């Protein structure tokens, strides 16, 4: 077996999650035969790829079915998040911007957004969390973060000096919220143009660095923020959060309609607070009716409320938290759905950064 034969053999393996050959997906990065032992490198499209240990068996079975009894392959697995830098000419270097929205308040949207951000970070991704709920910012409290964003000066290619906000960093996440700019008990009473200006600054004049995912906590309902984001960015998509009962589902339908109208693709639906109090399965049923992916359930559990109240929402990822596995499954489903869309979409040309 030479290297070309080995490569051709492995390129035909069908990815168990994406349903396409590794060669077609560009995931086989190396295949060499060194003294009779296959050396293989596979690059996954996200660190949140589920059950990565399956690849050892898939690789060994493919090699042995074609070349007979051979030593087990020395398999290395790496990852590179797929995505198109979403900022275009505003200079935001983020591979995937994901909006988290709902049709109404009270369904745990902000808590879910924060948990998703920390969940994706726990797999090794570089993640930011933007609180776009300007009238009711809760991300600073949920994450236990405080202080004011710093300001640094950058000199552009034209020689002009620009000021950029520095996100607050907490437990590995980069955070930004109007809650860092006003007192905790101060209401933000702004009209739409002021809201648009602030969000533009949060995107265009903030030093986010290079991120794999930027999670945007949307305000409840439908309105200005979705319009602003659709005008500024090319989003990977939106996650709609709702609870199982019908009254929440009715408003989730409106959120889905809003994202459709502003040309933001809907990644799928997450059912939050699943359990005996609110019931279960309503979001899954609606996802099936609308042909949208159902991304999973997050059970109703007092630990989420306690950790959020204490400013320790990151601790939902601790082994002791009863919802940890459910949350990680939702994160994996979101990451894989985004990866599927990116792999199926043609690459966009790189835009000039002004």
What does each of the following model-derived ranges do?
Residues 1-29:
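N-proximal, solvent-exposed amphipathic alpha-helical segments enriched in charged/polar residues
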Residues 10, 28, 63, 94, ...:
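Residue-level signature of catalytic and energy-coupling elements of molecular machines
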Residues 24-27, 32-101, 331, 342-345:
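Extreme N-terminal, non-catalytic leader segments
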Residues 97-133, 256:
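Walker A/P-loop phosphate-binding motif and the immediately C-terminal alpha-helix
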Residues 120-185, 196, 203:
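Phosphate-binding loop that captures ATP/GTP phosphates
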Residues 150-153, 178-194, 200-228:
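Switch II (G3) loop of P-loop NTPases
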Residues 205-208, 212-310:
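Conserved catalytic-core segment of NTP-binding enzymes
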Residues 310-324:
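C-terminal boundary of histidine-terminating zinc-finger modules
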């Amino acid at each position: 077996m030479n290297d070309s034969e080995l490569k051709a053999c492995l390129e035909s393996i069908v990815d168990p999650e994406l349903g396409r050959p590794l060669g077609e997906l560009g995931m086989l990065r190396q295949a060499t035969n060194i003294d009779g032992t296959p050396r293989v490198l596979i690059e996954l499209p996200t660190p949140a790829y589920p059950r990565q240990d399956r690849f050892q068996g898939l690789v060994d079975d493919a090699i042995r079915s074609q070349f007979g009894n051979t030593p087990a392959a020395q398999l290395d697995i790496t990852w590179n998040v797929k995505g198109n830098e979403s900022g275009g000419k505003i200079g935001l270097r983020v591979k995937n911007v994901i909006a988290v929205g709902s049709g109404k308040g009270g369904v745990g949207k902000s808590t879910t957004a924060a948990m998703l951000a920390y969940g994706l970070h726990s797999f090794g991704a570089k993640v930011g969390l933007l609180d776009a709920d300007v009238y009711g910012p809760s991300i600073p409290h949920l994450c236990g973060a405080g202080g004011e964003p710093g300001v640094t000066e950058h000199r552009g290619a034209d020689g002009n000096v620009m000021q950029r906000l520095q996100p607050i960093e907490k437990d590995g996440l980069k955070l930004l919220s109007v809650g860092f700019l006003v007192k905790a008990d101060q209401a933000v009473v702004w009209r739409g143009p002021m809201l648009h200006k602030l969000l533009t600054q949060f995107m265009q004049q903030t030093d986010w660095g290079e991120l794999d995912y930027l999670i945007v906590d949307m305000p409840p309902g439908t309105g200005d923020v979705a319009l602003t984001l659709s005008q500024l960015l090319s989003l990977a998509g939106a996650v709609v959060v709702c609870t199982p009962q019908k009254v929440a589902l009715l408003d989730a339908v409106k959120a889905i309609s809003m994202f459709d109208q502003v040309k933001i693709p809907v990644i799928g639906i997450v059912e939050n607070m699943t359990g005996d109090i609110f019931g279960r399965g309503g979001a899954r049923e609606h996802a099936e009716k609308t042909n949208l992916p159902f991304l999973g359930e997050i059970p109703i559990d007092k630990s989420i409320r306690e950790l959020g109240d204490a400013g320790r929402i990151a601790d939902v990822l601790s082994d002791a938290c009863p919802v940890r596995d459910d949350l990680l499954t939702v994160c994996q489903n979101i990451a894989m759905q985004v990866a599927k869309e990116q792999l199926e979409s043609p690459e966009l040309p790189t835009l000039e950064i002004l």
